[in-house]
Amino acid sequence: MVSFILQTEKLCKTFSNGGVMQHVIKNLDLEVEEGDFTVIMGSSGSGKSTLLYALSGMDKPSMGKVIFDGTEIQNKSNDELATFRRGNCGFVFQSIYLLENQTVLDNVLTGALIVQKNSPELVKKAKELLEKTGIKETSWNKYPNQLSGGEAQRVGIVRAIINNPRILFADEPTGQLNSAAGNDVLDIFTEIHKNGQSIVMVTHDLKTAIRGNRVLYLRDGGIVGDYRMPRFGEDDIKERKNKLTEFLGDMGW
């Protein structure tokens, strides 16, 4: 039986632009299966990031429902939403938000202590995750301004996953990285997905989108394309790229 971790019903989001209401998301229905790596694509202004923020509870919809594991979240108070996010969601953004006055290890632990109590086990887990994502012990006492962009983004990912979130949201996580650093970060997302993590990611980049097993294409605030693939690594990479490119071409990408 299919298990949906996230659903929307008639989701709408509007903004006032010079006194004129702009409909960014329009009556959008969506079901996200638990364990899927869902990629959201579309042209600039199509509503990608707006949808991501509504799905994650970081922004409330104007109308409609957002349902997380059977529970509606759109009418929760800001405090209730903050509590919900801490226990269920991890976030990785294009702009890397690390606390400049804290070391790498302390940045990760600060994120963890929002949910968990400090303990030797927690510190051990933080160090293990940093190692797994390529941040060696020699960097644990460095400060953010001593890291490369790729290193800082990897620290951000560790901070996002240390609390074992049910779902991980990412908004253009490789957008400010060079190609090599971007590939390293994508390898981490692929490994996380192989371990059963649900991921919803916004991107405009083909080499990022190819890592997912589902690609949604947005236009004018609605889903106009829904393409599914095997999990990354389970099919021929060249054929995978060609088929996804063909789908995106049909969408006008």
Language model feature labels by segment:
Residues 56:
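Helix-to-loop junction immediately C-terminal to a conserved catalytic motif
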Residues 72, 120-138:
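Conserved ABC ATPase "signature" region
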Residues 102-111:
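Short coil-to-helix segment of the ABC ATPase nucleotide-binding domain corresponding to the Q-loop/switch region
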Residues 164:
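Conserved catalytic motifs of ABC-family nucleotide-binding domains
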Residues 168-171:
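Catalytic Walker B motif of ABC-type/P-loop ATPase nucleotide-binding domains
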